[in-house]
Amino acid sequence: MSKSWGKFIEEEEAEMASRRNLMIVDGTNLGFRFKHNNSKKPFASSYVSTIQSLAKSYSARTTIVLGDKGKSVFRLEHLPEYKGNRDEKYAQRTEEEKALDEQFFEYLKDAFELCKTTFPTFTIRGVEADDMAAYIVKLIGHLYDHVWLISTDGDWDTLLTDKVSRFSFTTRREYHLRDMYEHHNVDDVEQFISLKAIMGDLGDNIRGVEGIGAKRGYNIIREFGNVLDIIDQLPLPGKQKYIQNLNASEELLFRNLILVDLPTYCVDAIAAVGQDVLDKFTKDILEIAEQ
């Protein structure tokens, strides 16, 4: 005997009421999944269905979708050439590639518009999704049993705690605090942030200390502490070229820490586009958590 519509609704409401988690979606990042799957058709409906499916899988009482809208004003203030390498890459596109990109971003815009009818969805000009996600975790993460970050971006692992994990829809893997060494060659988030400050991030055009990769960086952090501890101890002993480079990089280390430390600088990153913007975003997120 098939279920009545009333029974189906009752079970759906009971399932929703049992959810205790928060899910934060890297919305632009998720959109590129459809582009990389060579989708040349509108994908708004599939986009929202994917988020709904993930929300059910991760028992999300609250789901928040975030999008990027231009480069981070905050990071550009500290590093004017931030992500400048991407501008060069885009300038070299063929006319066909430009047309496909324009079409994709139109479809992505449609996906976000449809998403707004189902989930709280935010894009702020000059603020990156990373910073909004970090602030949401800081502001309301403690109100939930667990927080799930949906992104392929490993930078989001700077937000991991015992109660915060990440799922990547490309690797189909979950990333937890206990797995930091396996995925990032460090023992914890503090070391991960310090390693990123030392190495930089060429993908974002952030220069690091020349001659120091993941292995050397990890060994330095293990011996001398986090990046602020290292700065306090400069110059470090040693005649190796990479040590000399490190000793000459105090300003670079400070700058890079500001650029990569999402938990510490997320508030500043949002406020960089206006205190009123931060205040409204704070109010909106707190209201969502109360629902």
Curated annotation (Swiss-Prot):
Mg(2+) 2 binds at D130, D153, D155. SUPFAM superfamilies: 5' to 3' exonuclease, C-terminal subdomain (SSF47807), PIN domain-like (SSF88723). Changing R172A: 10 fold increase in the dissociation constant for pseudo-Y binding. No effect on 5'overhangs binding. Mg(2+) 1 binds at D130. InterPro entries: 5-3_exonucl_a-hlix_arch_N, 5-3_exonuclease, 5-3_exonuclease_C_sf, DNA_polI_H3TH, FEN, FEN_D15-like, HhH2, PIN-like_dom_sf. DNA binds at K83. Residues 190-263 form the 5'-3' exonuclease domain. Signal peptide: none annotated. Changing R216A: 100 fold increase in the dissociation constant for pseudo-Y binding. Drastic increase in the dissociation constant for 5'overhangs binding. Binds divalent metal cations, probably Mg(2+). In vitro low metal concentrations selectively stimulate the endonuclease reaction. Endonuclease activity is suggested to require only the first cation, whereas exonuclease activity is suggested to require binding of both. High pH favors the exonuclease activity whereas low pH favors the endonuclease activity. Metal ions enhance substrate binding. Inhibited by p-hydroxymercuribenzoate (PHMB). Changing R33A: 10 fold increase in the dissociation constant for pseudo-Y binding. 3 fold increase in the dissociation constant for 5'overhangs binding. Its cofactor is Mg(2+); K(+). Three alpha-helices form a helical arch which forms a hole in the protein and through which the 5' flap of the scissile ssDNA is threaded. PANTHER family: 5'-3' EXONUCLEASE FAMILY PROTEIN, FLAP ENDONUCLEASE XNI. This is Flap endonuclease. It comes from Escherichia phage T5.
